[in-house]
Amino acid sequence: MNTATNPAAVQFIGENLLPGQLGYIFTIVSVVASLVATFSFAKAFYTNEITQQNSWQRLANIAFIIESVCVFACFGVLFYVISNHLFEYKYAYMHSDKNLPFEYLLSCFWEGQEGSFLLWSFWHCVLGLIIIN
């Protein structure tokens, strides 16, 4: 990316961009897998033929498992960012501190709106995995 046309693209020395890029990729894959799972579960519910119903159900289960893995990975990436005090990320900068003990670092997850939404997604995936198994 050309930094002359996009000044926000400047990369500073020692800046750790990989967690943000991984989180972005996991988020996109999670949303796409969620849409595929929703569509597939609906098709499985409304299909009358057993073989097609089983096929749609299998696709829905696989898509939901992919969504769950991506949500868990996002949770892990955010934990990495917070626990390693990567303050180049706004969420870590706004919701954590170097002096916080571990249990308070863990509670930084749901302090902000984004982390709270991630926590709800996490529990949605846990309960969904219990239900489909």
Residue ranges and their predicted role:
Residues 2-133:
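Polytopic transmembrane helical bundles with strong interfacial aromatic enrichment
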